[in-house]
Amino acid sequence: VRGAADLPAARRGGIVSGMCANYTPVTDFERMKLFFAVMRGDPVPEETWPGYGAPFVRQARDADGHRREAATGLFGLIPHWSKDLAIGRHTYNARSETVHEKPSFRDAWRHGRRCIVPAESIFEPNWESGRAVRWRIRRRDGAPMGIAGLWGAWRGPDGRELLSFTMLTINADGHPLMQRFHKPDDEKRMVAILEEPDFDRWLDAPHARMRDFLVRCPAESLEAEPAPRQPPSRQRASVA
């Protein structure tokens, strides 16, 4: 899994195209346990980009029924038919309107491989000054975000299995906060942020109800501020 030092220069500067390509994962063990009811032991970078390893929460089955478990996967879903990992540079977000038909995502959607991506904050470019300025967006109440996502498993030529995940996005045209990000003429998008009471409902929902959870988070529940990128860390995360 690549680290920040391997990123292209434009990405090291903190601005990338696309929707949510950069976020801060939840790294604190107690916050993972408190807000997501899972234990996680893998180290992760302080910021995540496509191709990095980061935690996600999925449903597991044991003798007592369903439960949540934390796993570590690549940010950017790798479909089982892909020949290599490069496709993950383009599959870190899945549009909710077309996720059921796009080859990269339709199997995960059809088979209900839903997950929750724990994030302290996400980063988006604000163009109000005439140039892209990176801003941090987070929950106003101090809780981490639980972002609706899909996960998949990919087996490489060496037989090793790698997990990966993507964030689901929805239209945000007219959203009081999210309309401030990306270029003025771009369609406005936002990740689908789940409320805590909906975590298990999202993971357990019948297939026909999956889209019921992909709704806009109210602007009053979020806050945003400029957050210029710091010099990159060389920390790497493993998904082995």
Question: What residue ranges belong to the model's regions?
Answer:
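Short linear sequence motif anchored by a di-proline
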Residues: R2-A240
